[in-house]
Amino acid sequence: MAKQEQNIVYLYCDGACRGNPGPGGWGVLLRYNQHERQLHGGVANTTNNQMELTAAIEGLKSLKKPCQVVVTTDSQYLRRGITEWLPVWKRRGWRTSNKKPVKNQPLWETLEREVERHTIVWHWVKGHSGHAENEIADELANRGIDEVLKRGVQ
């Protein structure tokens, strides 16, 4: 485990989908000082990007008070969306540069509300490249899918 600063929450999140759309899952690994918490869930019919957003939302929602947070994701869609594209989309009335509606607008709006509660630094890591915490988040996301499939909801 890499050395971590005290009093900062480290949130590692990932989304996964089997088929796109298809059954999907999200996973979150949270670390704060010596404490660790794992969260996961799944949805019967979703997309990979929706699960990436949901992972970040659920991780941030789980924090009971405003915090300093370092979020690590392997999703450029999530990282660039929240740090670069969101203000532009809002200025354009939730339209992309080619005038089409932004996909997943309700999730982006929910994520923005959660982000506003905290001071966040966003990091991107290459997926499936051996980053230990990202691999755990990926395993949790896949557990979410497995649980959805086990329930027989497709």
UniProtKB/Swiss-Prot annotation:
InterPro entries on file: RNase_H, RNaseH-like_sf, RNaseH_domain, RNaseH_sf, RNaseHI
Catalytic activity: Endonucleolytic cleavage to 5'-phosphomonoester
EC number assigned by the record: 3.1.26.4
GO biological-process terms attached to the record: DNA replication, removal of RNA primer
Record-linked Gene3D superfamilies: Ribonuclease H-like superfamily/Ribonuclease H
Enzyme class: hydrolase
Broad class of the protein's primary localization: cytoplasm
Residues in the signal sequence: none
Descriptive protein name: Ribonuclease H
Organism, as annotated: Coxiella burnetii (strain RSA 493 / Nine Mile phase I)
Gene: rnhA
